[in-house]
């Protein structure tokens, strides 16, 4: 499909109070432009439990009312794909999307270029040794809002940090 309309908010954890407003504006836009909603996609996480519950509840309500399917999107895989397609890296690099989980923790995973799990999805405490066993042998491309705080901690020669890769909620 093609994104017809979207909103972005980078003002911290305010999505719970804005989600309903954004959905109404998008539904009004769709009605006014004659755009048919064929499905609703929602993040399956990982992420804030409360945020995911709110998003899934809103999405399920929309699907029920519109009689359309609900599509679950794994956020870390989406970030890895976005990083792959926006940047050119050699074939043998690994991709490590990260979602900030407060303090020095991130939700993360490591994927190869076919999106096979190299390190499973989980919550990880970041220190100078995080992923060092992989970094000793392969280049890893770190992306997502959680990678920003890791840049000053993971100082390995094979660590590549890409900025500006964030999931888009539409």
Language-model features and meaning:
Residues 1-46:
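N-terminal beta-alpha supersecondary unit
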Residues 37-43, 51, 94-98:
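Short glycine-aspartate micro-motif
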Residues 10-18, 49-53, 57, 74, ...:
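Residues at secondary-structure transition points
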Residues 2, 69-168:
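Surface "functional belts" at beta-alpha junctions
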Residues 41-75:
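DPxDG-like acidic metal-binding loop motif
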Residues 23, 58-62, 79-83:
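Buried hydrophobic packing segments
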Residues 26-30, 65, 83, 169-170:
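Stable alpha-helical structural segments in soluble proteins, enriched in small hydrophobic residues
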């Amino acid at each position: 499909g093609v994104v017809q309309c979207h909103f972005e908010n980078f003002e911290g954890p305010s999505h719970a109070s804005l989600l309903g407003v954004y959905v109404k504006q998008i539904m009004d836009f769709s009605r006014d432009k004659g755009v048919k909603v064929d499905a609703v996609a929602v993040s399956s996480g990982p992420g804030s439990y409360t945020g995911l519950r709110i998003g899934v509840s809103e999405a399920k309500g929309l699907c029920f009312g519109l009689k359309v399917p609900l599509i679950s999107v794994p956020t870390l895989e989406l970030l890895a794909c976005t990083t792959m397609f926006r940047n050119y890296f050699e074939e043998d690099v690994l991709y490590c999307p990260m979602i900030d989980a407060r303090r020095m923790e991130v939700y993360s995973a490591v994927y190869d270029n076919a999106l096979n799990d190299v390190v499973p999805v989980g919550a990880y405490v970041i220190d100078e040794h995080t992923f060092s066993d992989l970094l000793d042998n392969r280049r890893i491309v770190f992306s997502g809002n959680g990678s920003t705080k890791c840049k000053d901690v993971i100082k390995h020669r094979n660590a590549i940090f890409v900025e500006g890769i964030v999931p888009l909620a539409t």
